[in-house]
A protein has these predicted regions:
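Short coil turns that delineate tetratricopeptide repeat
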Residues: 34, 68, 102, 136, ...
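TPR/TPR-like (Sel1-like) alpha-helical repeat modules
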Residues: 167-173, 181-209, 216-217
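Terminal, low-structured helical/coil segments at or just beyond the last alpha-helical repeat
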Residues: 198-201, 207-250
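Alpha-helical segment of the N-proximal tetratricopeptide repeat
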Residues: 2-38, 42-49, 79, 83, ...
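Helix-start (N-cap) detector for alpha-helical repeat units in TPR-like alpha-solenoids
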Residues: 3, 37-38, 71-72, 104-106, ...
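A conserved position within tetratricopeptide repeats
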Residues: 30, 64, 98-99, 132, ...
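Structural signature of tandem alpha-helical TPR/SEL1-like repeats
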Residues: 16-24, 50-62, 84-96, 118-130, ...
């Protein structure tokens, strides 16, 4: 006898990437034990990996309902909600976790990020401030604060927090982008553009597109007629930006 339980085998399937098999195994268990919270948790994780988020949410909620005190289940539910784009609901779950353990900065930072995703920047700033108060040297907390303050239009506060985040998270693209955003908000257009251009050369995919769009908007507002003509042609602007051929004045 190996001594391994069916749940151990399901975990192995999930870790090995065989999520369809994990779902089938959990279905078999729940057919005979529908109130097994641990099985609902594993089924939710497998479904989430498969992108079946609606089903994953239902199983995560079942796990929470069956054992409301299990932190792991609430974390899972918050993650599923976030992936579904239900950022307000995810923020509420993270806020509940943080309330039960106020010294845990991870959940408070997660709440702040979800508040931004839910277009609730003021509440995100409040959560981020709590995290910074708990641990001023936490780069993720400073980053969340910088992003929230930028969304609320607080240029000075965003610049201070973003500078801290960039120092605490050296080279981190998100921290560098937050600092560029704060500089733009504080009318340091030249510094913001230079950082956006640098990020555009280093990033790819959607991240590159996002920072390029910011650089393009900034450039269009500062350049002369020739620069505006360049900015009007997206592929040309992106190509010139990545080669360092574009700049703006002070």
């Amino acid at each position: 006898m190996s001594g391994r339980s069916p749940l151990d085998e399901i975990r192995d399937a999930i870790e090995g990437g065989d999520h369809e098999r994990a779902v089938r195994m959990t279905d078999a268990i729940l057919a005979t034990r529908p109130g097994d919270d641990a099985t609902h948790e594993l089924r939710a994780r497998a479904l989430m990996a498969l992108g079946r988020l609606g089903e994953a949410e239902r199983d995560a909620k079942d796990a929470v309902r069956l054992d409301p005190e299990e932190i792991r289940y609430r974390e899972l539910l918050a993650e599923v909600l976030s992936r579904e784009g239900a950022h307000h609901e995810a923020a509420v779950e993270y806020a509940r976790l943080a309330k039960n353990d106020p010294r845990q900065t991870t959940w408070t930072i997660a709440e702040a990020r979800e508040r931004l995703g839910a277009a609730e920047p003021a509440m995100g700033v409040e959560a981020a401030r709590r995290a910074v108060q708990l641990d001023p040297r936490n780069g993720a907390a400073q980053l969340a604060l910088a992003q929230g303050l930028a969304r609320t239009g607080d240029a000075r506060g965003a610049l201070l927090a973003a500078t801290q985040a960039a120092e605490l998270l050296p080279g981190d693209p998100s921290a560098r982008e937050a600092l560029a955003d704060a500089r733009w908000l504080a009318d340091d257009d030249r510094g913001a553009f230079a950082e956006f251009a640098s990020l555009a050369r280093e990033l790819d995919g959607g991240d590159r597109q996002r920072v390029t769009a910011k650089a393009r908007a900034l450039y269009r507002g500062e350049a002369g007629w020739l620069g505006r003509a360049t900015a009007a042609i997206g592929p040309l602007f992106s190509w010139a930006l990545r080669r360092g051929w574009l700049q703006i004045g002070s």
